[in-house]
């Protein structure tokens, strides 16, 4: 179902199945396929040779580059053709050869992606992942199933993330990181094997986090990684330190929710 304005923006070689819903000013490039159950919001541009399968909803002003695969079946041997979905927000950039898969019934049956994210070429988002806003996944970075990637996190090129792992807000993973346990908010990791390497103070400063909050986060990092405290004791001390700091409180709440342990 398309508006008349949309029809002029669909290349004649593109295939749009009948139940797909395209808002105004959506552009579909040559040889792309838009399947049944796909909804695309206003101003979104889909390049050539893109495949989008439903149920998938895509918000406004996204840019999807050539040869990307959006809303494909999950790569899970337990998947048995159940109806599951992919939800993508607004203003995301999805570069060439990226793949974003639908969810599975073993979780919430949906993969969720927020707003203003950048997925560079050859990135992969597996089934049931939940991604926040303003995330960057550099070329070749891949998320296994059920990963949570919180807002403003950055994954360097070819970073691999184990299933069910949580990566906190404003965290940073260097190129080629192998992440097998949770990464607390604001923490930088890298190396072989991948280990913590301080806090992402530059990213915090760029996003307007105050010098006082950065000082508190740096002190919390030392409690977790430098003072030989049990994690539970470090969390208790961080909670006492947090006061009115939303950032440090977010770090405490994240650590209390950890189930796989944190990368050390």
Q: Which residues does each predicted region cover?
A:
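Terminal amphipathic alpha-helical/low-complexity segments used for targeting or macromolecular assembly
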Residues: 1-13, 18, 24-25, 61, ...
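Structural signal for interior beta-strand "rungs" in well-ordered beta-sheet cores
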Residues: 4, 9-190, 194-195
């Amino acid at each position: 179902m398309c508006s008349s304005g949309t029809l002029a923006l669909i290349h004649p070689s593109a295939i749009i199945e009948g139940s797909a819903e395209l808002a105004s000013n959506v552009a579909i490039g040559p040889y792309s396929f838009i399947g049944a159950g796909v909804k695309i919001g206003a101003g979104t541009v889909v390049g050539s040779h893109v495949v989008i399968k439903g149920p998938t909803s895509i918000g406004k002003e996204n840019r999807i580059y050539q040869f990307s695969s959006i809303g494909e079946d999950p790569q899970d041997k337990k998947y048995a053709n159940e109806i599951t979905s992919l939800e993508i927000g607004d203003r995301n950039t999805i570069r060439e050869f990226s793949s974003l898969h639908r969810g599975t019934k073993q979780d919430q049956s949906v993969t969720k992606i927020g707003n203003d994210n950048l997925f560079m070429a050859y990135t992969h988002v597996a089934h049931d992942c939940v991604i926040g806003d303003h995330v960057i996944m550099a070329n070749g970075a891949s998320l296994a199933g059920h990963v949570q990637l919180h807002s403003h996190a950055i994954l360097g090129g070819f970073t691999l993330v184990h299933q069910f792992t949580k990566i906190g807000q404003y965290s940073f993973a260097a190129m080629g990181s192998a992440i097998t346990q949770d990464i607390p908010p604001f923490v930088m990791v890298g190396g072989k094997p991948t280990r913590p390497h301080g806090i992402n103070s530059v990213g915090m400063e760029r996003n307007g986090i105050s010098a006082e909050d950065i000082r508190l986060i740096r002190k919390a990092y030392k409690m977790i990684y430098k003072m030989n405290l049990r994690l539970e004791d470090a969390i208790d001390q961080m909670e006492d330190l947090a006061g009115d700091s939303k950032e440090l409180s977010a770090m405490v709440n994240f650590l209390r929710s950890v189930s796989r342990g944190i990368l050390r």
